[in-house]
């Protein structure tokens, strides 16, 4: 294997995981903060807000998992070799 291709694949894998986690991380923090604020304003709607929050967090976390899958594909099933 060409060492330059291997080094580029490792750097790309790191960038894939890093960049794929920035957006969902910010989004999850914002969503959780807004959910806490909403529960503080309307405590009787806690169940509905919590359910919606958990579903939203799962969808946001899926984006990070896609970045991890791309990184693992670059590291272990490298198409550039």
UniProtKB/Swiss-Prot annotation:
Molecular function terms, GO-annotated: lipid binding; proton-transporting ATP synthase activity, rotational mechanism
Entries under Pfam families matching the protein: ATP-synt_C
CDD domains in the cross-refs: ATP-synt_Fo_c_ATPH
Membrane topology: Multi-pass membrane protein
A GO cellular component annotation in the UniProt record: proton-transporting two-sector ATPase complex, proton-transporting domain
Marked site positions, Reversibly protonated during proton transport: 61
Subcellular location: Plastid, Chloroplast thylakoid membrane
Keyword Membrane: yes
UniProt similarity note: Belongs to the ATPase C chain family.
Entry protein name: ATP synthase subunit c, chloroplastic
Organism: Atropa belladonna
């Amino acid at each position: 294997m060409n060492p330059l291709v291997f080094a580029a694949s490792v750097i790309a894998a790191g960038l894939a995981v890093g960049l794929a986690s920035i957006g969902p991380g910010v989004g999850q923090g914002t969503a959780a903060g807004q959910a806490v604020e909403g529960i503080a304003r309307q405590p009787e709607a806690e169940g509905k807000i919590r359910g919606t929050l958990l579903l939203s967090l799962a969808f946001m976390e899926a984006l990070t998992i896609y970045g991890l899958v791309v990184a693992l594909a670059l590291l272990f099933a490298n198409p550039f070799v």
